[in-house]
């Protein structure tokens, strides 16, 4: 599976950080809403929902979900 530095090489993606049951994705300006749209349309049970601005996405995660599961899922949304 793809790690964060691999995803960073993809167009639009800059970083991913976790705090409790929240994840924050930073993107280049203008990319956040399209990435959030792709995340939301996968109906992934461990991500309750997203809120996107111009260059930031907040993901609300299911309680106690393993960060590795989220990173793995995101590697399919944000491929190399």
What do these predicted regions represent?
Residues 2-71:
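Non-DNA-binding regulatory cores of transcription-related proteins
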Residues 70-80:
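Short, charged, intrinsically disordered terminal tails
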